[in-house]
Amino acid sequence: MPPKKAPPGPSKKTEQKKKEKVIEDKTFGLKNKKGNKQQKFIQQVQKQVQSGGQHPRQDGDKRKEEKEKKLAEQREMALIFKPVQTQKVEKGTDPKSVVCAFFKQGTCTKGDKCKFSHDLSQENKVEKRSIYVDMRDEDDPMTNWDDAKLKEVVEKKSSGEKQRPTTDIICKFFLEAVEKSKYGWFWECPNGGKCIYRHALPAGYVLKRDKKKEEKPTEISLVDLIEKERAALGPNQTRVTLESFLAWKKRKIAEKKAKLAAEEERKKSDFSKGKQFGISGREMFSFNPDLVDDGPMEEGDAAFDVYNREDDDDNAVEFKELDLAALSLAAKEVDGSGTIASTNRLLDQATEAAKTAAAEDAAADEDGPSSSAPANDAAPINKDLFVDLAGELDDLDLDDEDDD
């Protein structure tokens, strides 16, 4: 018998109507609300109902899980086909100077937390050759000898070849190379590989270039320098005062003017002789004003004239040029009289106050008790002076009305 057909499910229109009914029930009375919160709630309900109650972020989570699954598979394949042995570093070696083996194959998952270096150029960086170790001092045990080396040693001993003596003296070529920073893995001694002198510095040896750095010049402060120069002048010197300074300033200004005048005369004489080196264009026109007239006008030339503009606003303000030399010559010493307090000012004030008090006491003793008693010649006080003042004022008003 053929299998039973599955019962027909609800149509899409029916499902859509159900969803619209659910949305209408949940948002009843909120469609006409214009508040931001109400509108967001309506949109959220519509999205939930349309998506069938599933959270929209589930698709993103699925994609993330699939991506992680693929990465895990790639790691497993890399471990299968590209096995890497665990790196071991000798004691005292910086791990950052060793390139990570997993990083070379692109399988390192530690990133910046990896203790090994992820810089591929680190392999090209070789440790500098030590200047305190002679590479020829390394022991060469017999276990590392080959047949050729063994034969060479036997022949040397049988022939009785004399070995060149060795010494603790440092090779001068080695010292020169170290001082000039030329010593390295590619440096070779001019004496060859059989040089009897040492190619290493003893412990505690200081190079000349390092000595120069250590010998810093003694620094002296500005105050100490001024005091030193003043002491070197000697005791018999002219003291600088305002008058001597102004005289010196005046003499310097005169010397400067004389020097400028002599220089101008020299340039003028050179210009008259045809020498124009070191002469500016302004000086040329000042020495020979005829140079302004450059000949008759030609076709295409523009005519112009120079004149001074007269403006009331410009003439209303008068400007004066300040001459520092004239101001310095007109300077005078400050008169400190009346502005500087004396050292005995407090004692003087106390003495003056004591004198004033003594004078007042003496005057009081001379006057006697009559000075404190009231004077008998004083006019008597009339207590009823203003008693009838109100009546008098009323009489005055009546008189004024009668007059009117």
Swiss-Prot record:
Record has Metal-binding as a keyword: yes
Pro residues biased stretches: 1-10
Protein's GO biological process: cytoplasmic translation
Keyword Coiled coil part of the UniProt annotation: yes
Zinc fingers classed as C3H1-type: ranges: 94-121, 165-202
Record's compositionally biased regions (Low complexity): 38-50, 352-361, 369-380
Extent of Basic and acidic residues compositional bias: 12-28, 56-71
Entry keyword set: Coiled coil, Metal-binding, Phosphoprotein, Repeat, Zinc, Zinc-finger
Residues with PTM Phosphoserine: 221
Single GO MF descriptor: zinc ion binding
Region of interest (Disordered), ranges: 1-71, 352-380
Chain segments annotated as coiled-coil in the UniProt record: 246-270
Stored Pfam families: DFRP_C, zf-CCCH
SMART domains assigned: ZnF_C3H1
Modified residues (Phosphothreonine): 218
Family designation: Belongs to the ZC3H15/TMA46 family.
Protein name: Zinc finger CCCH domain-containing protein 15 homolog
Biological classification of the source: Eukaryota, Metazoa, Ecdysozoa, Arthropoda, Hexapoda
